[in-house]
């Protein structure tokens, strides 16, 4: 890095006029000289880089891209279906995670829905004014002792019955709700 040297002179604060008594004696100038470096301003050149999207494409590709971007959604869907048939590919072969995330997208194979046969009765909440009635309902529906029934309704939500039939779950829900508890069937 090249720099330019220059000097600066500092003079003494003493008066520059000599007194009459020292007129014959030459008075030496008190001066100090220090080199000063002045920084040379560097101009950096910026090079312009085109974004990747601005890469030139053949005229045929540009024309095709313009036509595709002007399609309506219905026409674009038809184009996708046509290209899938012509090329023998599916969108699922390119994005297997998308198919797992959206199982409704694969309409070709209807899913077999099995009807649930076993249900769980869950006590979600018991208001403080309905605790005694709920404990009585729990004891009537199960063979639990008073202490066990009381522990069951503390620290909710808890499963009250597991793996029971739909009728039995509905009956237990009805009795517990009549006692004042909030119940759900899972």
From Swiss-Prot:
GO cellular component, one term: ribosome
UniProt keywords, alphabetically: Chloroplast, Plastid, Ribonucleoprotein, Ribosomal protein, Transit peptide
Main location: plastid
The organelle targeting sequence, given as a residue range: 1-53
Region (Disordered): 1-23, 162-186
Superkingdom as given in the UniProt entry: Eukaryota
Compositional bias per record (Low complexity), positions renumbered to this chain: 12-23
Name under which the protein is recorded: Large ribosomal subunit protein bL12c
Localization: Plastid, Chloroplast
NCBIfam families tied to this protein: L12
Organism: Nicotiana tabacum (Common tobacco)
GO biological process entries: translation
Pfam family, one: Ribosomal_L12
Stretches with biased composition (Basic and acidic residues): 162-180
UniProt cross-references to InterPro entries, sorted A to Z: Ribosomal_bL12, Ribosomal_bL12_C, Ribosomal_bL12_C/ClpS-like, Ribosomal_bL12_oligo, Ribosomal_bL12_oligo_N_sf
GO MF terms, alphabetically ordered: mRNA binding; structural constituent of ribosome
Comp. bias intervals (Polar residues): 1-11
Recorded family membership: Belongs to the bacterial ribosomal protein bL12 family.
Matching PANTHER family: 39S RIBOSOMAL PROTEIN L12, LARGE RIBOSOMAL SUBUNIT PROTEIN BL12CX-RELATED
